[in-house]
Each structure stands twice: as C-alpha cells, then as structure tokens.
C-alpha cells in the first residue's frame, strides 16, 4: 500500500471499536468465542431392534470417495463455484454488530395441533421449528433436521439462541422411522437433540445424510447411519430417499470446512414426491430436479436467514428465490421453513413472511400454494385438496 504502515490500516477499525455500546461489546466477545471454536463455520452399543426395511440402492465406500465434479479428494465444492472465503465470513460477523435488526427475546406459541401416530392416506406436515418438520406419509414418520436445543452453537453459553420454543416437545413425538439430516451446521445437525431422540425411540430410526456425516451420527447412537453422495438413494419402507445437489457449505469447526457433503432430499412415496431443501442458495439445480423428480406434492423450502445478500445469496434463498424454486420444482404446495426461531442474519423476525407474501403477489400466486405454519401446526393433503388447521402468520 505504497509504504503505508500496517498499523495505520487498523485506525478505522479501532475507531469503530470506540463506538461500541455495552451490548455490542458483549456480542463481540460472544462472536469471538464462537468464531474461534468454529472457524467461522456458522451457517456453519447394539441396536435393540431391527431397522425398518432399508436397502441402499447405491452404497458408497465409507470415508473413501472418488474424485468428482464436487469432490477433489480432500474437500467438497459447489458445482456452481459459489463460495465465500474466510475474509468474507469475518466481514459478515463484524458487520453483524451494527446491522442486525432487533428481535424479541421470546414469542409464545399458540396451542399445537394434536399429533397422530400414523398417516396412511395423503401427506401430513407438522412444522416444529426452524428446519424441523414432522412429515407423515404412507405409514412412515419422517423428521427433518431435528433441533430442540436452546442454542445452535458449539457451546451452551454463546451463539444464536432461540426466541420460540419447538412447537412439539421432543418427548411428545410419535415413533420416528426416518430422519433426514441435510448437512452438519449446528442449526441443522444438533447432536444433543439427536442423542435424546435416539434414547427415547424403541427402534433405531433410519438416519440419512451426506458423505462424511455418518461417523458423527453413529456417536449419537445411530449405528446404522446411511451416508449418500449426490444422486444416490436408499429405500425405507414404501419410500425411496434420494440425496440431491444443493448450493451450500459445511463445517463445525476450524479444521473440517467443506469436509462433509451437504444436500437436499427427494422422498418418493405412493402419495407423491416430497422435497426437503435443507439450506441452499438458488441455482439451476432446482429446475433440473423438478424435471427429474417432479411434480412434487409438497416442498419444504427455506425462506429466512437471507440478509445481507452480498454474503447470503450463494448459500441461502430469500423469499423471492424460494418462490422461484417452488415454480422450478413444479411443486403443487410448498411450506416455508428456516425462519423466525434463531436470529442468524440481519433481517427482522417478520421480514420472511412479509417478503414471501410480496413475492407470491408479484407472481400472481395465491398464498394457499406456498404457506407458513406456526410451530406445532399441521397441514394434511388429501388427493389434490388441502384440509388446513393453519393460518398464514400475521
């Protein structure tokens, strides 16, 4: 920099430090602890009974995977090339001190809808919280990205803290047959919840995730954890589970960034195909998957954690992009997830719903085609008509 001393470059930074409020200093200390532990990764016995019928259609070699379009022998990549470096991640966390909208400390949930043990006709979806949904179809109980912890963080004293309780206590769940884990970020792979869920289940559920995640899942008691590459599948009861491409990243610490595979799920059932996106940015993969597996009876699409766009666009949909994904997938109905529970990014707590309504209106789509639920509320689809106990959150 033309002979400019290195220390001189930090003067603007030091000036901003002097402006910090007591609350911002506390937040800075918290962020520092979490970043040191995670490496900026935010966003980063014998089974007692037989498993349900589970036959991998294609079985990867555990821990040894061939080089591919998204794996170079050491790390996984997005095929689009979208990625953010450590500098961008650090910049995002620093700017969080000044740019995050204020969220309420807590929001009470309305009374939950009654939980049924099994559903043999149609599809019943119960929103629990964040990306956790109980999907009941064809006699199977499916749980996505189970999270019941108070914080989504490597430590219990720092990191994003929930402002809404799960809509269903973990103890109140029916018997779970299949768990889908989209990737290993703390707000999607919650080891405390997974361990408790395993302990209370008489039979070991089938748990499916991307390459590299099985070892961690087995430590939580899922000895028969299945890990899949993009395009691979496994059979669970009357459902075929496909692990498919999405645009995101992985990592739980400083030394495992992009070492495990992230992805979305397609679950083909006699009642129709179901799509669970997990976490993803928008890319052509939605159109490809819509053509390959669609139409979808139900899609679970993230609508929150999307600001600022310069950082989040590659890895998180905003509501407008979620509506486009809904159309690309040829989804008859979509449920918005991943919002209003943990403050991960800058937008206000009610922005995802308002922006979703605006995006639907701009496309001339009724809210009945892409809706949201309160934690604990359920929707049931029979044939092509929806019988709803829910309402769009106002």
Language model segments and positions:
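Catalytic core of the metallo-beta-lactamase
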Residues: 132-136, 235-296, 313, 317-321
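Bacterial N-terminal signal peptides that target proteins for export
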Residues: 6, 17-28
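Active-site metal-binding motif and surrounding structural segment of the metallo-beta-lactamase
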Residues: 67, 157-208, 224, 294-300
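Acidic/histidine-rich helix-loop elements
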Residues: 148-165, 249-256, 307-316, 343
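Metallo-beta-lactamase
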Residues: 35, 41-161, 166-172, 210-276, 355-377, 382-383, ...
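A short acidic, amphipathic alpha-helical/loop segment
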Residues: 192-197, 220-221, 285-289
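Cap/insert and terminal regions of metallo-dependent hydrolase folds
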Residues: 41-42, 55, 62-63, 71-77, ...
